[in-house]
């Protein structure tokens, strides 16, 4: 006959059930095991371990925020001078912002629209042309392919500003033959910007295209799809992060560009925000830093909005595009 199994609840002291106050139920207070306590770390050890990182982070944040606070304070200060803006937010008035759109001597609205048109058109065309070039280098095999890639790398070493004199002389010659894309036109400036942006961005996209498995487009070609269909319907959706990154970086670089735009755009009606704001503070007796600060803040708004909307694509696009 089998032994009867005891199904009663075991004694708490026998199994060592831990009570809510940290002791063992059923044991005398003197026999309770000691409760482990966390040893307090000294300030010197904490600072050597991780505290210095907090200090460096706060210094970096202060270093980045102070210029922003200063320019916001200057834009709200009706005095319009740098000496009057030494004390942050000592006076607050929307007068500088009103002057940007009410003063006939400051066509800020025209400058703003010109900058947006040039930046948007250049960004869109740059993304399209760079994507086409990157797809060709990544998926096609043709004579001169390696030489073309090396040329793109070499072109990245020379900034576009080095050729500003040659660009000016070339645009004068183009104006005699094709006035629509010559000196003083938006189309001419866009062409100059495209020439400087295609090299580095094509190579950046080329690295991202290489991360897409070639079996995907090969399967589409077996089903009868051509290069155009593979590119527009399959590849472009897969490389969306790098397209957004290239478009955003191009837009940021152009919306505030001054040196080349000041050489190409000689007509005041075609000038951009960067040129117009420079004119506000270039005069010896007519400097108005308050209006300049207000215009600079408004010019930065599109960049901030685009960056916030596309920030989740930036890290992935840059990391994947940097790997060949």
Kindly label every feature range from the protein language model.
Residues 1-57, 286-289, 311-324:
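Transmembrane alpha-helical segments of polytopic membrane transport and secretion proteins
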Residues 53-324:
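A structural signal for multi-pass alpha-helical bundles of membrane permease subunits
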């Amino acid at each position: 006959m089998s032994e009867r199994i005891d199904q009663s609840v075991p004694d708490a002291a026998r199994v060592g059930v831990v009570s809510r106050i940290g002791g063992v139920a059923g044991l005398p207070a003197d026999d309770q095991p000691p409760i482990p306590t966390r040893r307090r770390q000294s300030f010197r050890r904490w600072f050597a371990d991780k505290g210095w990182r907090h200090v460096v982070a706060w210094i970096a944040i202060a270093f980045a925020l102070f210029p922003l606070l200063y320019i916001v304070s200057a834009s709200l200060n009706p005095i319009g001078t740098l000496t009057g803006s030494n004390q942050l937010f000592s006076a607050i008035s929307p007068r500088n912002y009103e002057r940007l759109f009410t003063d006939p001597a400051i066509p800020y609205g025209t400058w703003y629209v010109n900058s947006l048109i040039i930046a948007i058109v250049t960004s869109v065309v740059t993304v399209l042309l760079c994507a086409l070039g990157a797809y060709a280098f990544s998926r096609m095999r043709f004579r001169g392919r390696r030489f073309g890639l090396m040329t793109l790398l070499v072109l990245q070493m020379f900034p576009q500003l080095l050729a500003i004199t040659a660009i000016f002389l070339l645009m004068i010659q183009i104006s005699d033959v094709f006035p629509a894309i010559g000196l003083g036109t938006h189309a001419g400036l866009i062409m100059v910007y495209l020439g400087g942006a295609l090299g580095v961005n094509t190579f950046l996209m080329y690295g991202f295209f290489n991360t897409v498995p070639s079996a995907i487009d090969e399967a589409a070609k077996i089903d009868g799809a051509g290069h155009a269909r593979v590119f527009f319907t399959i590849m472009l959706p897969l490389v969306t992060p790098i397209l957004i990154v290239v478009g955003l970086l191009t837009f940021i670089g152009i919306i505030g560009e001054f040196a080349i735009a000041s050489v190409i755009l000689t007509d005041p009606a075609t000038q951009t925000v960067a040129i117009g704001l420079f004119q506000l503070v270039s005069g010896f007796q007519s400097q108005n830093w308050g209006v300049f600060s207000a215009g600079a803040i408004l010019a930065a708004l599109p960049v901030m909005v685009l960056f916030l909307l596309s920030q989740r694509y930036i890290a992935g696009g840059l990391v994947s595009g940097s790997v060949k």
